[in-house]
């Protein structure tokens, strides 16, 4: 005689597979997909930087770390130093 219900383990496996599928779909539909982060989480590894980004360091052999200009801390320090010299 066959059981009328599934074992609890099969329900857990189905839920795990569903969660995995949802995560993969969300990652693929994200604007940057699976792009690796760099420069303390502020940059992204790319083959070439966008116009609004600056090159910072290498990401492996073929990629470079691209940091948005507004998140580049060194550029903000440099800008502040120039403006503070004007007031002296």
Curated annotation (Swiss-Prot):
It is found in: Secreted. Residues 1-27 form the signal peptide. Its main location: secreted. It holds the Pfam family Defensin_beta_2. Keywords: Antibiotic, Antimicrobial, Defensin, Disulfide bond, Secreted, Signal. One of its GO terms (cellular component) is extracellular region. GO terms for biological process: defense response to Gram-negative bacterium; innate immune response. Disulfide bonds join 38-65, 45-59, 49-66. Has antibacterial activity. PANTHER family: BETA-DEFENSIN 115, BETA-DEFENSIN 123-RELATED. Belongs to the beta-defensin family. This is Beta-defensin 115. It comes from Homo sapiens (Human).
């Amino acid at each position: 005689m066959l059981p009328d219900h599934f074992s609890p383990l099969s329900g857990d496996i189905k839920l795990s597979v569903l969660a995995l599928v949802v995560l993969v779909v969300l990652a693929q539909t994200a604007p940057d997909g699976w792009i690796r982060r760099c420069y303390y989480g502020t940059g992204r590894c790319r083959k070439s930087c966008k116009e609004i980004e600056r090159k910072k360091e290498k990401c492996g052999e073929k990629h470079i770390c691209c940091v948005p200009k507004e998140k580049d801390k060194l550029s903000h320090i440099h800008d502040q130093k120039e403006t503070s010299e004007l007031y002296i």
